[in-house]
UniProtKB/Swiss-Prot annotation:
GO terms for molecular function: methyltransferase activity. Pfam families: LCM (PF04072). This is Putative S-adenosyl-L-methionine-dependent methyltransferase MUL_4761. InterPro entries: Ppm1/Ppm2/Tcmp, SAM-dependent_MTases_sf, SAM_mthyl_Trfase_ML2640-like. GO terms for biological process: methylation. Keywords: Methyltransferase, S-adenosyl-L-methionine, Transferase. NCBIfam families: mthyl_TIGR00027. S-adenosyl-L-methionine binds at residues 132, 161-162. It comes from Mycobacterium ulcerans (strain Agy99). Belongs to the UPF0677 family.
Length: 311
């Protein structure tokens, strides 16, 4: 279903279902022989009866079959599990470094089924704010409570749409603009239109004290990247049509939910232009550093992880 400017969802629909996909990958990685990450909460979060249909839809999207005539392009479960394991490991390390430097205020934007408040070794006095839609946050809180899980850090849910006045909602929840903050925008940007991305970065900057940090998963926004994305979209459309003709389920596809309007900011350039010290890591290089072969240089491994600090 096409996105609209003010659409909404729960954990089993639209953008919410993509959080299920991510948690499924974290669960698979955790259960593997040599996991990069350990997320013991991912499996219980995705194993509930109400997510049965989503699990089937994601499995169909991930399936790699001999009938696919463009195998180098096909998304498969191992590729996505590897990518999301590398991504999770990188941003886990980002938070570990941030609190080691003395930061005790954390904001996770579009938190979805993120369980870092429950599984990372947070120092005493750390406050974690999770922002997402109310139904998504409610599902996570109630599911983990049924399993007896308790957050390691102090945790405050901020139920608000990131296209609305989320900074005010964050401050109303107790966020202190005078304290340095570690911000995270993981897997978020494509689900926001360009104007909302600019507004997001502006709000982060305006609400960040000296010593704050931000980490962003960066998807291609330059002209070459946009052309490559358009080519991938055309290839996937052809592949998808053939799957549909064979009677396969193609109802789940995160790319259906992405905004592709022009003017999306490059986070590294944006924060550098606003006085932050920035760095970026190409995901394929990070995967190789961690011993994971980047299975496709055309897939998500071409993304970048951007980090920045406010002097």
């Amino acid at each position: 279903m096409p996105r609209t400017a003010d659409d909404s969802w729960d954990i089993a629909t639209s953008v919410g279902a993509t959080a299920v996909m991510v948690a499924l990958a974290r669960a698979a990685e955790t259960a593997s022989e040599t996991p990069l990450i350990r997320d013991q909460f991912a499996e219980p979060l995705v194993s509930t009866p109400e997510l049965a249909a989503v699990r089937e839809q994601v499995a169909a999207w991930w399936a790699q079959t001999d009938d696919d005539d463009d195998p180098d392009f096909t998304v498969d479960s191992q590729q996505m599990t590897d990518y999301l394991a590398v991504r999770t490991h990188f941003f886990d390390s980002y938070f570990i470094d941030a609190v080691a430097a003395g930061i005790r205020q954390v904001v996770i934007l579009a938190a979805g089924l993120d369980s870092r408040a429950y599984r990372l070794d947070w120092p005493g006095g750390t406050m974690v704010y999770e922002i997402d839609l109310p139904k998504v946050l409610d599902y996570k809180e109630h599911t983990l409570a049924r399993h007896g899980a308790a957050p390691v850090a102090a945790l405050r849910a901020v139920p608000v749409d990131l296209r609305h006045d989320w900074p005010q909602a964050l401050r109303d929840a107790g966020f202190q603009t005078s304290l340095p903050t570690a911000w995270l925008a993981e897997g978020l940007l494509p689900f926001l239109p360009a104007a909302a991305q600019h507004a997001l970065f502006t709000a982060i900057d305006a609400n960040s004290a000296t010593g704050s940090r931000v980490a962003v998963e960066m998807f291609g926004v330059d002209e070459d990247a946009r052309r490559a994305a358009e080519e991938r979209a055309q290839r996937w459309a052809r592949q998808r049509a053939k799957r549909q003709a064979r009677g396969q389920d193609t109802s789940f596809d995160p790319f259906d939910l992405w905004f592709d309007d022009e003017g999306q900011p490059d986070p590294a350039d944006w924060f550098a232009a606003h006085g932050w010290t920035t760095d970026s890591v190409q995901v394929g290089a990070e995967a190789l550093r961690l011993g994971r072969t980047a299975t496709s240089q055309e897939g998500p491994f071409v993304n970048r992880f951007v980090t920045a600090g406010k002097p």
